[in-house]
Amino acid sequence: MLEEPPKNAFLFLISHQPAALLPTLRSRCRELRLSALSQNMVQQALTQAKIHLSEEQSPLITRLSAGSAGQAIRLAQLDGDALYSALISTLHTLPNLNQSAALKLAESFAGQANSERFDLLIDLIDYILGQTAKTSLIPRDPDADPTALDQKLFTKLHKGPIGARKWALVQQDISQRMRHGKAVNLDPVTLILDMFFKIEKCAAAL
């Protein structure tokens, strides 16, 4: 029906990755791009959802949400700010990874009850590695707080254009491995440790 819609029909196809759609579908579509919400709008959405954040939580969660009210709610409900801080703190020990800290964090994901947190961890690692690659190309982000621990990490790991490419490849590889591993019910603790070791290997090689 999407490729050959009936006469006088209007169909809405919503996609967060339109480039991944089949060309036969895209050629029949008129694009209507929806921009991300501003941080103020995300905060308003959280208030409407009766989710109240502290002054310390609010800026980080709205930034990590990337303009998505749904992602902001998810981050708030799953203590995403605390998980993000734990990841940044552990990765800040690179290129000589604190393996005890990595193991402790990985073991907190044992069991089926942590399935949603594991999905969130994948999203946060995607963000962290993506920002690391971006910083390798554009070292100074005028909107970022240079004193924040995550910004110090991105600056510490950036190694120019070559580093940007390597971090982007590591991000893609880790994301695929983690998502596939969960789909086939591999041990999340093992997957997370493997993730940390791959990141450590990349950091040591640059």
Residue map of PLM features:
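Charged, glycine-rich active-site and insertion segments that engage polyanionic ligands
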Residues: 7-10, 16-124, 131, 135-206
